């Protein structure tokens, strides 16, 4: 499966990013490049909406950590919402549920 990256600005003036599909070793660079580009362009807090995220592997989690660090350097925030139970479990097992603000 492939990855589609949708994004919009929310009413809270946050950049909401919706990865659609799978984030793995093959699609992680695309996600990283797009989000880093958006951070440079918009310089806003980010919400990752996992509603349509079907799968994420360790390379995808690494990309999210890179995004987290980049936002921290800019005094910006990231939150993750609407994760499916199997994906939340991966965040829980790796301890990233304590790093990221995860809601829903």
PLM segments and residue spans:
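Short acidic-hydrophobic, aromatic-tinged amphipathic segments that line or gate anion-handling sites
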Residues: 101-104
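Amphipathic alpha-helical interaction surfaces in cytosolic regulatory modules
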Residues: 25-99
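STAS-typified acidic loop motif
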Residues: 7-33
